[in-house]
C-alpha cells in the first residue's frame, strides 16, 4: 500500500489501535510507524578524516587503463620542463661512416636488396680435408665469416619479403646452403680434434708415453 494512502487512512481513523488496523501484509508501513522507536539515521563522527568530505585519500581513484581515464587531480610529470622537439631542418647533416661494421650486413654496393647475379656468384663449400689442414685461428675466422654472410642473406630475404620482389629466393637459398655445408664441415673437424684430444688424455693417464717406444727402437 502506498505511503500516502496509509497516512490518509490513519488521519481518517483518528489513531485507531492496532486491532482495528488493516493486516500487516496489506499496510506494513502503518504498523511499523506505530511501533518503531526513533533512532538516529544520520552518521556522526568527530574525527577529521570523516569530516573532510572534499578530500580523497585514494590517489589512484578514477584511473582506468580500460576506459583510458586519468587521475582526478593534476599530476606533475617532472620538476623540469619537457624538451621541445627540434626541426629536422635545423639539425646538422651527419655523414655516414664509410667503414661502419653494420655495412657487413649488406652487399658490397651497400644496397638494401642483393641481386640474383650477386647471390649466384659464389664458389663451392670447403671440404673436410681442406678444413683439417687449417689452424684453430683459421677455423675461428672462417666460421664467423660464414655467420656474417648468412646474416647478410637473411637481411636481404627480409627486405625481399617486405618489398614482395618475387625474385632472388632460389639464388639466396643456394648460397645459404653452400655456407651451411662449410659450417657443418668446421664442426666435424672440431669434433674430430676433440675426440683425438680425449683419446690422448686417456692414454696419458694409463701410462702411455711415446718417447718410451722411441727408446726401445
UniProtKB/Swiss-Prot annotation:
GO terms for molecular function: structural constituent of ribosome. InterPro entries: MRP-L47_sf, Ribosomal_uL29_mit. Its main location: mitochondrion. It is found in: Mitochondrion. Pfam families: MRP-L47. One of its GO terms (cellular component) is mitochondrial large ribosomal subunit. GO terms for biological process: mitochondrial translation. Keywords: Mitochondrion, Ribonucleoprotein, Ribosomal protein, Transit peptide. Coiled coil: none annotated. It comes from the Eukaryota. Component of the mitochondrial large ribosomal subunit. Mature mitochondrial ribosomes consist of a small (37S) and a large (54S) subunit. The 37S subunit contains at least 33 different proteins and 1 molecule of RNA (15S). The 54S subunit contains at least 45 different proteins and 1 molecule of RNA (21S). Belongs to the universal ribosomal protein uL29 family. PANTHER family: LARGE RIBOSOMAL SUBUNIT PROTEIN UL29M, RIBOSOMAL PROTEIN L47, MITOCHONDRIAL-RELATED. This is Large ribosomal subunit protein uL29m. The gene is mrpl4.
Amino acid at each position: 500500500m502506498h505511503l500516502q494512502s496509509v497516512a490518509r487512512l490513519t488521519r481518517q481513523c483518528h489513531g485507531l489501535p492496532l486491532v482495528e488496523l488493516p493486516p500487516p501484509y496489506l499496510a506494513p508501513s502503518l504498523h511499523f510507524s506505530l511501533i518503531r522507536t526513533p533512532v538516529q539515521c544520520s552518521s556522526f563522527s568527530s574525527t577529521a578524516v570523516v569530516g573532510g568530505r572534499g578530500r580523497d585519500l585514494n590517489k589512484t581513484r578514477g584511473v582506468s587503463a580500460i576506459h583510458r581515464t586519468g587521475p582526478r587531480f593534476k599530476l606533475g610529470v617532472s620538476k623540469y620542463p619537457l624538451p621541445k622537439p627540434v626541426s629536422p631542418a635545423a639539425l646538422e647533416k651527419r655523414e655516414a661512416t664509410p667503414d661502419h661494421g653494420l655495412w657487413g650486413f649488406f652487399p658490397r654496393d651497400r644496397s638494401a636488396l642483393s641481386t640474383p647475379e650477386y647471390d649466384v656468384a659464389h664458389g663451392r663449400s670447403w671440404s673436410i680435408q681442406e678444413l683439417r689442414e687449417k689452424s684453430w685461428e683459421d677455423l675461428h675466422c672462417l666460421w664467423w665469416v660464414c655467420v656474417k654472410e648468412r646474416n647478410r642473406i637473411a637481411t636481404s630475404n627480409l627486405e625481399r619479403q617486405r618489398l614482395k620482389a618475387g625474385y632472388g629466393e632460389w639464388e639466396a637459398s643456394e648460397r645459404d646452403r653452400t655456407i651451411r655445408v662449410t659450417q657443418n664441415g668446421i664442426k666435424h673437424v672440431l669434433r674430430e680434434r676433440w675426440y683425438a684430444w680425449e683419446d690422448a688424455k686417456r692414454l696419458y693417464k694409463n701410462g702411455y708415453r711415446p718417447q718410451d717406444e722411441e727408446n726401445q727402437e
